[in-house]
Amino acid sequence: MSLPEKAFPVSWDQFHRDARALAWRLADNGQEWRAMVCITRGGLVPAAIVSRELNIRMIETVCIASYHDYDTQGQMKVLKSISPEIAKSGGEGVLIVDDLTDTGKTAAEVRAMLPKAHFAAVYAKPKGRPLVDTFVTEVSQDTWIYFPWDLGFTYQEPIAKGTRG
């Protein structure tokens, strides 16, 4: 796989710094979070870092598949919903965390589930930016972010090659 013209490769160190910067911004918000919902799979790594920094212990996941191939976004499919215990308040006191808000489709889907929640992402693109409350870095819509869990020294196919997003 060749890198597109506007590639933004992110190292583990860079991602860790950016996720901690997100935690700092959220801490400055002054909000007490009763729970965190991370959007899997991309939100797992920043959720681990942010939850540690903000001492959030109740962590839930929501799984929405939108990339059925590595680089092709398709129809949204909810693979795992948010627990009724977290969802019952409409998201009040809940922090949603993801790595990136790109087109905003996934964010809109989760926002509909938790309309009162605070949505945070490490990176945001212009189409998804209106749906996120807190983010660290904005990149152009035509930039492809290469996350460290997708890369080795070159692009790495997932071990389970036959699986889709």
UniProtKB/Swiss-Prot annotation:
Record's GO cellular component terms: plasma membrane
Key words of the record: Cell inner membrane, Cell membrane, Glycosyltransferase, Magnesium, Membrane, Metal-binding, Purine salvage, Transferase
Cofactor: Mg(2+)
Ligand binding (GMP): D102, T103, G104, K105, T106, W144, I145
InterPro entries from the UniProt entry: PRibTrfase_dom, PRTase-like, Xanthine_Guanine_PRibTrfase
Enzyme class: transferase
Primary residence: membrane
Reactions catalysed: GMP + diphosphate = guanine + 5-phospho-alpha-D-ribose 1-diphosphate; XMP + diphosphate = xanthine + 5-phospho-alpha-D-ribose 1-diphosphate; IMP + diphosphate = hypoxanthine + 5-phospho-alpha-D-ribose 1-diphosphate
Binding site for xanthine: D102, I145
Binding positions for 5-phospho-alpha-D-ribose 1-diphosphate per the UniProt entry: R41, G42, D98, D99, L100, T101, D102, T103, G104, K105, T106
Annotated GO MF terms: guanine phosphoribosyltransferase activity; hypoxanthine phosphoribosyltransferase activity; magnesium ion binding; xanthine phosphoribosyltransferase activity
List of residues binding Mg(2+): D99
Annotated Pfam families: Pribosyltran (PF00156)
Similarity annotation: Belongs to the purine/pyrimidine phosphoribosyltransferase family. XGPT subfamily.
PANTHER family: XANTHINE PHOSPHORIBOSYLTRANSFERASE, XANTHINE-GUANINE PHOSPHORIBOSYLTRANSFERASE
Protein name per its UniProtKB record: Xanthine-guanine phosphoribosyltransferase
Organism: Sinorhizobium medicae (strain WSM419) (Ensifer medicae)
Lineage of the species this protein comes from: Bacteria, Pseudomonadati, Pseudomonadota, Alphaproteobacteria, Hyphomicrobiales
Gene: gpt
